[in-house]
Amino acid sequence: MDLTCKDVCYSIKDKKILDHLSVSVDKQRFVSILGPNGCGKTTLLKNIYRVLKRDSGEIVFNGKSIDDLHLKEAAKKIAVVAQFNEINFDCSVKDMVLLGRTPHIPFMQSETHKDYEIVEDALQKVGMLDKADRSYLSLSGGEKQRVALARAIAQQPTLLLLDEPTNHLDIRYQIEILQIVKDLNINVLAVLHDIQLACRYSDYIYLMKQGTIRYEGKPQTTITEQAMHDVYGINCKLTWTPDQQALIEYI
């Protein structure tokens, strides 16, 4: 199911954080948003999943304004992995992931065998099945991030919103997690920090600066030496491998 944001504006007091920003995700594509710290990437995601309320503009999901979408219906279709996943109550890893099934369980009914199968499959995908009975609070930051992704996968969404999903992960798990997300074959809108990983896994990239989209398109046409200088203020030499990996030499 498709997502379209058109001319979205958001301000804090007199400071404009998002300035007539437009992005879209469709056709089961992996779309990434890149840009320097403070440019509004996370703020955009929060406006999409309604933690923040935009000042103006349209956010449409599957042809319907998100303002008209009931929260439970939205939770069946849209999953979020936020940048920080600190939770103050403890439960098992399995029960934490089972929370992803909540929107699909009718009121006053219990989880089914199928729900538990979905949870186990999600834990298997992120390499955490062997820790299913562990205390969630005993996990490392990276393990908690993988559990958060498993919970999102267990929702079986058609749109996945990711805010730096590889935060706290070593490079092996960064690659594995992004490949898992890619293999879901659903619409993905991801805020990423690592430019090279974004180029490797993204079908389309938006480059943000100061609340606006400065560049957009396929990785090889968007991530250029000029764009890197304009957006990040750095000079670099950029080459591409045949399998769409960007090699960036900072100079």
Feature names for model-found ranges:
Residues 57-65, 74:
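Conserved ABC transporter NBD signature motif
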Residues 154-158:
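A short, proline-enriched helix->beta-strand linker immediately N-terminal to the Walker B motif
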Residues 135-139, 143:
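Conserved ABC ATPase signature
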Residues 160-164:
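Catalytic Walker B motif of ABC-type/P-loop ATPase nucleotide-binding domains
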Residues 49:
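Helix-to-loop junction immediately C-terminal to a conserved catalytic motif
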Residues 98, 113-131:
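Conserved ABC ATPase "signature" region
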Residues 34-36:
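The feature captures the beta-strand-to-loop junction immediately N-terminal to the Walker
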